[in-house]
Amino acid sequence: MTDRRRSMSCVHFFPLKSRGFLPTLTSKKRSVKLSKQDATVTVVILLLILLLGWGYSRALRLSQGKGNPIGRVFFYKKTATRKKNNQALWLKLKDGVPVYHRDVLRTTTGSEAVIVFTDNSRLDIAENTMVRISHTGMKKKDVRLVTGAIRYARAAGNPAAHTVHVGKTTISLSGDGQVNVRGGERDSTVEIARGEALLHDAQGQTLPLQTFTQLATSREDGTVRILHPTFVPLLPDQDALLLTAEHTRSVGFVWLGDATTVQPSVRLQISRYADFSVIETERKLTLPHEANASRTTFKTSERLGEGRWFWRLVPQNGTASAPRSFSVRRARKVMLHTPRAQAVLSYRDAIPPTLFSWTSVEDVEQYRLLLSSRADFSADVKTFSLRTPEISVPGLGEGTYFWKVVPRFDEGIEDPVFASEVGTFSIKQGKELHAPVALFPAEDEVLEHADRENRMVIFTCEPIPEARRYVWTVKNMDANASPLVTTTSVPFLTVPMRSLRARLQEGTYQWQVAWETRRSDRSPYSALRAFTVIEGMHAWEEEPETRDLIALRAPSFVLRDMPALITEKYLLQHRALRCKWTAVHNAQRYTVTLKNKKTDAVLQTATTTGVEFSFTNLAHLEEGSFHWVIQAHTEQEGYEPASAQVVRAFTIRVSELERPRAKEIVHYEYH
């Protein structure tokens, strides 16, 4: 072996972390020279390192796009992947990253995204969807659906041409148009959700499309079939939450119909079930015909209870519309009691605490009282949170005040729909006392009594917080007798609503009232009011004398122990339906009745001396709406034997638990 070969046999290659692959020489000789072959190997290794680095940097550039961004992508659920210019590399995207020209985005199962473009146009992407973006400056903006479902909304006032491609079909949007597209290259469905658009097919034909009026279906061969739906549901919208009034419980339904081809009738179906296996309400509607309008809006209303509902339209000749779900909650507007509207509270002495009271509302967790010196509540607002429908607020000085009450329900809902109107009142101190307002009998009122011997008339006036005594003056205008003057005292720290009960004969009377302070300062009298007392048509002298019985106060339900919606979870936990109410003074027993709200059938009636009852026979219960009915009873002398009935409505739903509200972008219904 020559010296040269001996020296090369000692040449080794091994990696160094900081320098890459470099040759290291170990030799017994002091100096060794490399051949051209060795240098070539070294250069090849260095080129491989540079190539790998360039590929990695290019992949990073692809993940961030290229050029000026045309928008940003955001994710409702999970994330999506993207590739650039038809490259094979799919990269995972982060929320809020830029989107570039010629990007291809892909979502998987459970992934939902939205792209907000720089011109405020929006592209909603459903799961399992692939879409290609092509926005070339301000002149042309294209979106191509490869497969899946999208919703593209064009921003109003944008001069660029917005088009959506699917298969061999092109849709051109104008104005603030919005299009829903579902399908792929072979078969797709197009719906114009808002505005107008033009549809261009493979044969070069152009078809106009209008809002809700036409559905276009493109086939593999490029032909287009235009469908004319007879009816298009509008309201209630999908997963809408409706707040209905206590006295009406009315839900409005709105849909569009083609007035030029409208059918003579349509059936509105409402059910608790999505498959309409049990139809709660079915109403056949005869529709008007308007020949001058291409589309006509139809409206109707139905009384519905609380809970989740589904509705659809069934034409006389045609398929039913897609079912829409909505929820109903019963709402009762808070009514203000005291201080009365436009009341003037005058005080000679120190101003006492002001009493605020209002009507109670079912299922309320908390009331919020807002008190301000400004009508718009923009400044100087005092807020009080409480569980009872009244409160005494001290420390109010002279001036004009505005107040309202907003209830908060068990679910945390606080909405202006439930809030009261804005009340106003004034406080004055050291001024002349103002006259009270006479309420009943009203001016020129005729009181007809069937009992000759007991013509009882009740006089009332508005409450005066500072009043400690009321002075009533009643004069018979048909006789020369002196007017009847009497006083009624107001005990300290009581609600100052006072009445006078007087037995009057037939005739015409005038009356007025004044009030006095604790220092016997008397206010001016109210305006004179005239009324007439007459004998009724059914007055009998032989009618036995009767006396007024004291009415039992009706019980009140303990709402925190009685939910309005009974679910499977509740039944598994309690194994019974529970009813609880407050005790009534002088009541000796209570009757509890469980009734079916729809059929009015009595499921069970029980008598108890307690204030709670449990219905454990759940085997005979079905889903639906029910009523608890409670009535108090007594046998004490001087009391009416039974109080007024109180009713509590509730709904049982076991087979279908509450589901969260679906997001707007992911539910596309096509037929």
Curated annotation (Swiss-Prot):
The chain crosses the membrane at residues 39-56. It comes from the Bacteria. Keywords: Membrane, Transmembrane, Transmembrane helix. Gene3D superfamilies: Immunoglobulins. GO terms for cellular component: membrane. Pfam families: FecR (PF04773). It is found in: Membrane. Its main location: membrane. It is a single-pass membrane protein. This is Uncharacterized protein TP_0484. It comes from Treponema pallidum (strain Nichols).
